[in-house]
From Swiss-Prot:
It is found in: Cell membrane. F-type ATPases have 2 components, CF(1) - the catalytic core - and CF(0) - the membrane proton channel. CF(1) has five subunits: alpha(3), beta(3), gamma(1), delta(1), epsilon(1). CF(0) has three main subunits: a, b and c. Produces ATP from ADP in the presence of a proton gradient across the membrane. Keywords: ATP synthesis, Cell membrane, CF(1), Hydrogen ion transport, Ion transport, Membrane, Transport. The gene is atpC. This is ATP synthase epsilon chain. GO terms for cellular component: plasma membrane; proton-transporting ATP synthase complex. Its main location: membrane. It comes from the Bacteria. CDD domains: F1-ATPase_delta. It is a peripheral membrane protein. The keyword Cell wall biogenesis/degradation does not apply. Disulfide bonds: none annotated.
Length: 133
């Protein structure tokens, strides 16, 4: 089976670069599975895990928004933030989740604060899910 090159890039630099059999990303329209020779496209990403499958193994990268650019031989993910599980501070992610939940439960907030807290909660849950903890 042929492979496809994957690059995950943030404003801080490259997070992942490698060849995989399949990439699964979460776009605003739903999950998208990408195999080698996929048609070209660009799609906006939501907060979620990028799954990188090679053989019987799977790696994940926690991504917080951005875009995916697909070409027949390469997938480039331009993310606002992205982390490999080994780079995630689980205690910090748990604390962020608790802060976001408490802000969501607060009665004194406007719509903007609510959306910020909701997004922070999604990011924290995604980071914890990717680490498996």
């Amino acid at each position: 089976m042929s492979t496809i090159r994957v690059n995950v890039v943030t404003p801080d630099g490259k997070v992942y670069d490698g060849d995989v059999d399949m990439v699964v990303v979460r776009t605003v329209e739903g999950e998208l599975g990408i195999l080698p020779k996929h048609i070209p496209l660009v799609a906006p990403l939501t907060v979620g895990a990028v799954r990188l499958k090679k053989g019987n193994s799977e790696e994940q990268v926690a991504v917080s928004g951005g875009f995916v650019e697909v070409r027949p031989d390469q997938v480039t993910i331009l993310a606002e933030a992205a982390e490999l599980p080994s780079a995630i501070d689980v205690d910090r992610a748990r604390a962020a989740k608790e802060r976001a939940e408490s802000r969501l439960n607060s009665t004194k907030q406007d719509a903007v604060d609510f959306k910020r807290a909701e997004l922070a909660l999604k990011r924290a849950i995604n980071r914890l899910d990717v680490t498996g903890k």
